[in-house]
Structure formats: structure tokens, C-alpha cells
């Protein structure tokens, strides 16, 4: 197996390898890579305008004319008055596809806008529904409050009515018992005698022989906040200058007790 040429060269420089094997020659096969469909000879013979070339279309086997600057094509020569210069079918398909794609994107964008608008409308409708439910709830609460107040008022009226009935029944029962006692008494009581008895005075009452007011059963009894001085507090007139006077400490204690009682009341 022959050594590579590079290794042979390094070994030869070091003096290890004395004989260099010749590098094998490669066979070069010439191929025609010229697949340019432009017919330069026909272009020169027809005298086409600048930038115009006659090109062979391998798909249909017919020639057409092509402008290299504008990339426009025509089936007829540019010198022919019936020639129509347009874009190639490939360009037209590409532009149409781009236009359709752009149109689809615009439609999609419009649909998204409509969807967004619909969602906003739905959100607004939900807000209205929520507001309506809130109003309905407030109305129900208000009606419930009114019903509760009405029930409480009706209950109070019934309680007052029952209380009035009870009071009337008690008064009626009391009056019946009074009449029954009068009927069961051994002799009828005269109201005039009762009033005359009330008008009579006790001979021992000071009001029967002096200007003193008529007393009651509690007149003359010691009061709770009254100082115990031993003096006659019922005396009036000339007897007002009586002895002994209460002590200053008793007066202060009585005043303090009276003010305390007034504050509690």
C-alpha cells in the first residue's frame, strides 16, 4: 500500500525515504454545466431592445422574451404591437399567494377584532346582569326589611291590644268584686258617711287647734338624711327660734347626704 504523498515528503526531508513514488494523475472529465436557457444568437439576430432576451421555456418547449431589468416577460417580440408585457406565471402565482395570505391575515385580524368586540359586549352584558342582580337583591332586602318592620309593628299593636284587653278585664273584675262586697255587706255603706269621716279631725292633731297643716301617718317620723339634734322640726312661727341648733358637722353631713341622693335620682 503506497504511503500518502505528504508523509513521503516529510520522510524524504529527514532522509528516511530515498525514493518518492509519483502522485497518480486524476482523470478530469469535462462536463457542460451551462444550462442557461437564453438564446443569445436569436437575441442578436432579432435585434431586440436593450435588456431584452429570447429565452427557451423547457416546460412547454416554446420561446418567450424576457426583460432582465424589470423581470417582465412576453410571448411576442417587444417589436410586435400585439405583444403583452406581464409578469411571469411564477411571479403572478407568488404575488397572488402573498395577496391571498395577506387577505387571510387581514380577515383573521378582523375576526379577532370581532371576537374581542364580542367578548367586550359579553363582559358588558355580564356587568349589566350583575348590576341587575344587585338591584334585585337590594329590592328584595328592602322588601324584606319592610315586611319585618310591618310584622314588628303588627306584633306591637297586638301586644298593646292584648295589654289593653287585660287591663280592661282587670278593671272590670275589680269593679265586679267591689259590687259583690257591697252586696254581701250586712248594711249598705253610705258614701256621705265615709266622706264625713274623712273630713273629721283628730282632736290630738295639731291641725285641729292651730295653723299647722294636716299631717299624715308618717308626719313627725325621723327622716333618713335629717340630723338628730333633738329639736322640734315641726315647730313654726315664733317657735322657729328654737334651741339647740344642730352642730356644723351634722349640717355638713346632712348636706352631703342630700346632694348624693339628688345625684342618684
From Swiss-Prot:
Outcome reported for the amino acid change (mutating residue 65 to A): No effect on transcriptional activation. Markedly reduced transcriptional activation. Abolishes transcriptional activation
Ranges for region Important for interaction with TXNL4A: 245-255
InterPro entries cross-referenced by the UniProt entry: WW_dom, WW_dom_sf
GO terms of molecular function: DNA binding; double-stranded DNA binding; ribonucleoprotein complex binding; transcription coactivator activity
Positions bearing Phosphoserine: 94, 247
Domain of life: Eukaryota
Effect of residue 251 to D: Abolishes interaction with TXNL4A
Effect after changing residue 248 to D: Abolishes interaction with TXNL4A
SMART domains: WW (SM00456)
Tissue specificity of this protein: Widely expressed with high level in heart, skeletal muscle, pancreas, spleen, thymus, prostate, ovary, small intestine and peripheral blood leukocytes.
GO annotation, biological process: activation of innate immune response; alternative mRNA splicing, via spliceosome; cellular response to exogenous dsRNA; defense response to virus; innate immune response; neuron projection development; positive regulation of defense response to virus by host; positive regulation of type I interferon production
Notes on the domains: The WW domain may play a role as a transcriptional activator directly or via association with the transcription machinery. The WW domain mediates interaction with WBP11, ATN1, SF3B1 and the C-terminal domain of the RNA polymerase II large subunit.
Protein's job: Intrinsically disordered protein that acts as a scaffold, and which is involved in different processes, such as pre-mRNA splicing, transcription regulation, innate immunity and neuron development. Interacts with splicing-related factors via the intrinsically disordered region and regulates alternative splicing of target pre-mRNA species. May suppress the ability of POU3F2 to transactivate the DRD1 gene in a POU3F2 dependent manner. Can activate transcription directly or via association with the transcription machinery. May be involved in ATXN1 mutant-induced cell death.
Connected disease: Renpenning syndrome 1: An X-linked syndrome characterized by intellectual disability, microcephaly, short stature, and small testes. The craniofacies tends to be narrow and tall with upslanting palpebral fissures, abnormal nasal configuration, cupped ears, and short philtrum. The nose may appear long or bulbous, with overhanging columella. Less consistent manifestations include ocular colobomas, cardiac malformations, cleft palate, and anal anomalies.
Protein's UniProt name: Polyglutamine-binding protein 1
Organism: Homo sapiens
Amino acid at each position: 500500500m503506497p504511503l500518502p504523498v505528504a508523509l513521503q515528503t516529510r520522510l524524504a526531508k529527514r532522509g528516511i525515504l530515498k525514493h518518492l513514488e509519483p502522485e497518480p494523475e486524476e482523470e478530469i472529465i469535462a462536463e457542460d454545466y451551462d444550462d442557461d436557457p437564453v438564446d443569445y444568437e436569436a437575441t442578436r439576430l432579432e435585434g431586440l431592445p436593450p435588456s431584452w432576451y429570447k429565452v427557451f421555456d423547457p416546460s412547454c418547449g416554446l420561446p418567450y422574451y424576457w426583460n432582465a431589468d424589470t423581470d417582465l416577460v412576453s410571448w411576442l417580440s417587444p417589436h410586435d404591437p400585439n405583444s403583452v408585457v406581464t409578469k411571469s406565471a411564477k411571479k403572478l402565482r407568488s404575488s397572488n399567494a402573498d395577496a391571498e395570505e395577506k387577505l387571510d391575515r387581514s380577515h383573521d385580524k378582523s375576526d379577532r377584532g370581532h371576537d374581542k368586540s364580542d367578548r367586550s359586549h359579553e363582559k358588558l352584558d355580564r356587568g349589566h346582569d350583575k348590576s341587575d342582580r344587585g338591584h334585585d337583591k337590594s329590592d328584595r332586602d328592602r322588601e324584606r326589611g319592610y315586611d319585618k318592620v310591618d310584622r314588628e309593628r303588627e306584633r306591637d299593636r297586638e301586644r298593646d291590644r292584648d295589654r289593653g284587653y287585660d287591663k280592661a278585664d282587670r278593671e272590670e273584675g275589680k269593679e265586679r268584686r267591689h259590687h259583690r262586697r257591697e252586696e254581701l255587706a250586712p248594711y249598705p255603706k253610705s258614701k256621705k258617711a265615709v266622706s264625713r269621716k274623712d273630713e273629721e279631725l283628730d282632736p290630738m292633731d295639731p291641725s285641729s287647734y292651730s295653723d299647722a297643716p294636716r299631717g299624715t301617718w308618717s308626719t313627725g317620723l325621723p327622716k333618713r338624711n335629717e340630723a338628730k339634734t333633738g329639736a322640734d322640726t315641726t315647730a313654726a312661727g315664733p317657735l322657729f327660734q328654737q334651741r339647740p341648733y344642730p352642730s356644723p358637722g351634722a349640717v355638713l353631713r346632712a348636706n352631703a347626704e342630700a346632694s348624693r341622693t339628688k345625684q342618684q335620682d
